[in-house]
């Protein structure tokens, strides 16, 4: 269980960082 939980936590963090970077690039392109 701990391995699965940490895996999902890492996946969620990676997804959040990726979406944040994508939004940042989109805002830069809009400017």
Swiss-Prot record:
GO molecular function, a single term: electron transporter, transferring electrons within cytochrome b6/f complex of photosystem II activity
UniProt subcellular location: Plastid, Chloroplast thylakoid membrane
InterPro entries registered for this protein in UniProt: Cyt_b6/f_cplx_su6
GO BP: photosynthesis
Major location category of this protein: plastid
Record's GO cellular component terms: chloroplast thylakoid membrane; cytochrome b6f complex
Keywords, ordered alphabetically: Chloroplast, Electron transport, Membrane, Photosynthesis, Plastid, Thylakoid, Transmembrane, Transmembrane helix, Transport
Membrane topology note: Single-pass membrane protein
Protein family: Belongs to the PetL family.
Function: Component of the cytochrome b6-f complex, which mediates electron transfer between photosystem II (PSII) and photosystem I (PSI), cyclic electron flow around PSI, and state transitions. PetL is important for photoautotrophic growth as well as for electron transfer efficiency and stability of the cytochrome b6-f complex.
Subunit structure, interactors included: The 4 large subunits of the cytochrome b6-f complex are cytochrome b6, subunit IV (17 kDa polypeptide, PetD), cytochrome f and the Rieske protein, while the 4 small subunits are PetG, PetL, PetM and PetN. The complex functions as a dimer.
Protein name listed in UniProt: Cytochrome b6-f complex subunit 6
Organism: Gossypium hirsutum (Upland cotton)
């Amino acid at each position: 269980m701990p391995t699965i939980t940490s895996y999902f936590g890492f996946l969620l963090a990676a997804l959040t960082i990726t979406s944040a970077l994508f939004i940042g690039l989109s805002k830069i392109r809009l400017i």
